[in-house]
């Protein structure tokens, strides 16, 4: 089904429009085998009227039936089409952008497309424990791939050397996977993966994490069939 774009959507967000909104569901740590721990996750991609989306993901360890056990972690950041800086961009810091936006139409944004490879994508993600990541990758239709370009670790950070992430929209559900290498020279290993359903946003009166939802309202549990 074609994505319907709001008339007032910032043009540069067109390639990311399928992500915008709230998502919830369950996943597993590690390689996803039956003996790995299950988590419940709520993800928000929020449009702010600027050429990037705000990202926030909250996760809780949970039982297979969705009962929350305890908080797991939170990560947040910003995702945007990768391009060179222009006068129409805000920042650094509180420096205001030029009143004329860098890209004023979808046709302008199309010039950033790299043919069949889609658009460049960059994401900055911050974690608890003094760890931040800078990712670069590609977004092509409802699929994306990212790999770390740089990682900032403070004294509270544990081993974490590089990572890749991928996500895609399949039958209206958001599938994602995250692979991590803890040390230089180490191979990437499965870190976590999940399948999320689109859910009402906070403004639309969404329920508390893990709350029982009417049948057909999303939030499929591990092991349930579509």
Swiss-Prot record:
Q: What does the entry comment about cofactor binding?
A: Binds 1 heme b group per subunit, that coordinates a highly solvent-exposed Fe(III) atom.
What keywords are annotated for this sequence in UniProt?
Heme, Iron, Isomerase, Metal-binding
EC number(s) reported in the record: 5.99.-.-
Keyword set includes ATP-binding? no
Catalytic class of the enzyme = isomerase
Report the cofactors.
heme b
Segments carrying motif GXWXGXG: 21-27
Region (Disordered) residue spans: 201-226
Q: What's the catalysed reaction?
A: peroxynitrite = nitrate
Q: Which GO terms describe its molecular function?
A: heme binding; metal ion binding; peroxynitrite isomerase activity
A single Pfam family, by name? THAP4_heme-bd
Identify the metabolic or biological route this protein is part of: Nitrogen metabolism
Ligand binding (heme b):
191
Family assignment?
Belongs to the nitrobindin family.
Q: What's this chain's function? A: Heme-binding protein able to scavenge peroxynitrite and to protect free L-tyrosine against peroxynitrite-mediated nitration, by acting as a peroxynitrite isomerase that converts peroxynitrite to nitrate. Therefore, this protein likely plays a role in peroxynitrite sensing and in the detoxification of reactive nitrogen and oxygen species (RNS and ROS, respectively). Is able to bind nitric oxide (NO) in vitro, but may act as a sensor of peroxynitrite levels in vivo.
Domain notes from UniProt: Forms a 10-stranded antiparallel beta-barrel structure able to accommodate a hydrophobic ligand in its interior. In fact, this fold hosts the heme group, which is located in a wide surface cleft.
Subunit and interaction comment: Homodimer.
- Name listed for the protein in its UniProt record: Peroxynitrite isomerase
In its UniProt entry, the species of origin is given as Micrococcus luteus (strain ATCC 4698 / DSM 20030 / JCM 1464 / CCM 169 / CCUG 5858 / IAM 1056 / NBRC 3333 / NCIMB 9278 / NCTC 2665 / VKM Ac-2230)
Taxonomic lineage per UniProt? Bacteria, Bacillati, Actinomycetota, Actinomycetes, Micrococcales
């Amino acid at each position: 089904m074609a994505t319907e774009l709001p008339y007032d959507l910032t043009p540069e967000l067109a390639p990311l429009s399928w992500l915008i909104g709230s998502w919830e569901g369950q996943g597993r740590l590690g390689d996803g085998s039956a003996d790995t721990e299950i988590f419940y996750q709520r993800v928000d991609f929020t449009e702010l009227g600027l050429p990037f989306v705000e990202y926030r993901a909250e996760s809780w360890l949970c039982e297979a039936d969705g009962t929350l056990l305890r908080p797991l972690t939170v990560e947040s950041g910003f995702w945007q089409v990768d391009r060179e800086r222009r006068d129409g961009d805000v920042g650094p810091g509180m420096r205001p952008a030029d009143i004329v936006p860098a890209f004023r139409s979808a046709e302008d944004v199309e010039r950033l497309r790299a043919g069949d490879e889609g658009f460049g994508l960059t994401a900055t993600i911050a974690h608890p424990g003094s760890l931040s990541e800078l990712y670069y990758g590609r977004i092509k239709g409802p699929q994306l791939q990212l790999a770390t370009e740089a990682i900032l670790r403070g004294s509270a950070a544990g081993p974490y050397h590089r990572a890749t992430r991928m996500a895609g929209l399949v039958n209206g559900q958001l599938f994602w996977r995250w692979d991590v290498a803890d040390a230089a020279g180490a191979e990437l290993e499965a870190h976590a993966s999940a399948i999320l359903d689109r859910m009402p946003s906070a403004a639309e009166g969404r329920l508390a994490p893990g709350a029982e939802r009417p049948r057909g309202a999303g939030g499929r549990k591990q092991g349930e069939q579509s």
